[in-house]
Amino acid sequence: MRFAFTTVSLSLLLSSLVASDAASSDVQFLTALVGDYQDHKTDYIKFFATAKDVPGDLSTLATKVLTYTDDSYTTLLNDDSLNVSNLEAYATSLPWYSRIQADAGGKGSASGSASGSGSAKSTASAEKSSGSSASASSTAGGSSSKGGVSELVAPVGAVVGALAVALM
């Protein structure tokens, strides 16, 4: 009986440690993302001007982060409706994802890292050759679209505005 109790106690302890590690890695990711945005606002604004399929969680999070004056915005991660995995997956599409990954302590998959690094290199070379970050973003973002520019203006404007205001 004592052995069973000890085994159950140990299992519960290990489960809580694993859950704690996951929350810690989410905090590291969010802190790295917000910090990177604060250091490179122009890059983000130009990227989101041409970005597609921006997760709704990102604009919701950006709006909520607006209300915080310090890093206590990480308490938003306790909200079960926030899909951090979705945000992390989207972040891998950012051309500078390797910066975020490095700041977050190397969290993420190797394929996400390789993809982010390659995009960052192609964006950097495109910026050097064209002198325009906006054209580099649109080149790196791809050229296929389902609708015209008018369909993107409102959603992109809302996301860019929320990010710009929330993370200043």
Curated annotation (Swiss-Prot):
Q: Where is this region: Disordered?
A: 111-149
Q: Where is the lipid attached (GPI-anchor amidated serine)?
A: 143
- Listed name of the protein: Repressed By RIM101 protein 2
This enzyme's EC code(s)? 3.1.1.-
Q: Record's Pfam families? A: SRP1_TIP1
Functional note: Probable cell wall protein which may have esterase activity, with a preference for esters of fatty acids from 4 to 16 carbon atoms.
Where does the signal sequence lie? 1-24
What GO MF annotations does this protein's record show? hydrolase activity
Where would I find glycosylation on this chain? 83
Per the UniProt entry, the propeptide covers 144-168
The family assignment reads: Belongs to the SRP1/TIP1 family.
Q: How does it sit in the bilayer?
A: Lipid-anchor; GPI-anchor
Q: What is its main location?
A: secreted
Top-level class of the enzyme under EC nomenclature: hydrolase
